[in-house]
Amino acid sequence: MGLLAGYQFVKDLESAGALALFVPPEGGFEGRYQRRLRSKGYTTLPMSAPGLGDLAAYLTQEHGIRPAHTGKEDIRVYFQPPLVTYHLENLPPNAKGLVLWLIDGKRLSKQEFAYLAQLTQTLPKFKVVVEVGGDRVVRWEPLADWVAAA
């Protein structure tokens, strides 16, 4: 069976750059929209929003990670490459772009939402979908409009 929904979702994401997504709490519906994005040539990167820390550092700058220790090991710092710029540099040649799909995004602050919306304007091949709440049906709106209204 072909995908029955999602054409308007892809068009709205391409025009807005970042979308606030409302999905039913039982889940499962957002998978068809992710499949629609992949069929249109986008690479999706699903992540959980809680625990990301400083979005600017995590997404676009090299950042240090300190692993947990029990007091018996040396305190170490591992350096990770920037998530978004690393994936954008390594996209397949025929890919339209990278879509960062943030699950449980309602825990992010207004400043973080505004930063994500601004980042999509800076990086043209980068798009963001943030699951910000629940609803009876899947619906979405531009993230910048949702932040302004909140």
Swiss-Prot record:
InterPro entries: NAD(P)H-quinone_OxRdtase_su_N (IPR020874). GO terms for molecular function: oxidoreductase activity, acting on NAD(P)H, quinone or similar compound as acceptor; quinone binding. Its EC number is 7.1.1.-. It holds the Pfam family NdhN. GO terms for cellular component: plasma membrane-derived thylakoid membrane. It catalyses: a plastoquinone + NADH + (n+1) H(+)(in) = a plastoquinol + NAD(+) + n H(+)(out); a plastoquinone + NADPH + (n+1) H(+)(in) = a plastoquinol + NADP(+) + n H(+)(out). It is a peripheral membrane protein. It comes from the Bacteria. Coiled coil: none annotated. Its main location: membrane. It is found in: Cellular thylakoid membrane. The keyword Thylakoid applies. Keywords: Membrane, NAD, NADP, Plastoquinone, Quinone, Thylakoid, Translocase, Transport. NDH-1 shuttles electrons from an unknown electron donor, via FMN and iron-sulfur (Fe-S) centers, to quinones in the respiratory and/or the photosynthetic chain. The immediate electron acceptor for the enzyme in this species is believed to be plastoquinone. Couples the redox reaction to proton translocation, and thus conserves the redox energy in a proton gradient. Cyanobacterial NDH-1 also plays a role in inorganic carbon-concentration. Belongs to the complex I NdhN subunit family. NDH-1 can be composed of about 15 different subunits; different subcomplexes with different compositions have been identified which probably have different functions. PANTHER family: NAD(P)H-QUINONE OXIDOREDUCTASE SUBUNIT N, CHLOROPLASTIC. This is NAD(P)H-quinone oxidoreductase subunit N. It comes from Thermosynechococcus vestitus (strain NIES-2133 / IAM M-273 / BP-1). The gene is ndhN.
